[in-house]
């Protein structure tokens, strides 16, 4: 069975809709800077409440999954490649800001997508 691009996209789109548990150590906002040739990952801390929702540790308010939120990041990581960014976050930063394997896998996938967009001169939108 040959999978075509549309089939692969449909698989990924379906998987993007699944429930995922949030990492209690926080989340990342990923973006690229084409001029600088860099991938950035801003790390934000959060607390997971009894409902499983991410809460801002400073305000105690639930962090919405959609829409603009004004928060101060804890750390910003930058790299020229997905691998360089992964080394900085997972190997050089102690303690590691990621505590869940599925979160680490997600970040690796997103960093590769960001790198491909950067190299191709395309826009990158985090999944």
From Swiss-Prot:
InterPro entries: PterinBD-DUF4346 (IPR025595), UCP037673 (IPR017260)
Protein name as annotated: Ycf91-like protein
Top-level division of the source organism's lineage: Bacteria
Name of one Pfam family that matches: PterinBD-DUF4346
Family designation: Belongs to the ycf91 family.
């Amino acid at each position: 069975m040959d999978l075509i691009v549309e089939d692969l996209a449909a698989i990924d789109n379906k998987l993007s809709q699944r429930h995922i548990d949030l990492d209690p150590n926080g989340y990342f906002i990923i973006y690229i800077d084409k001029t600088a040739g860099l991938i950035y990952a801003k790390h934000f801390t959060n607390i997971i409440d009894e409902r499983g929702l991410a809460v801002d540790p400073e305000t105690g308010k639930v962090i919405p999954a959609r829409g603009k939120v004004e928060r101060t990041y804890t750390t910003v990581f930058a790299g020229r490649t997905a691998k360089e960014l992964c080394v900085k976050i997972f190997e050089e930063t102690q303690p590691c800001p990621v505590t869940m394997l599925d979160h680490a896998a997600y970040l690796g996938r997103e960093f590769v997508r960001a790198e491909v967009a950067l190299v191709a001169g395309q826009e990158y939108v985090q999944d």
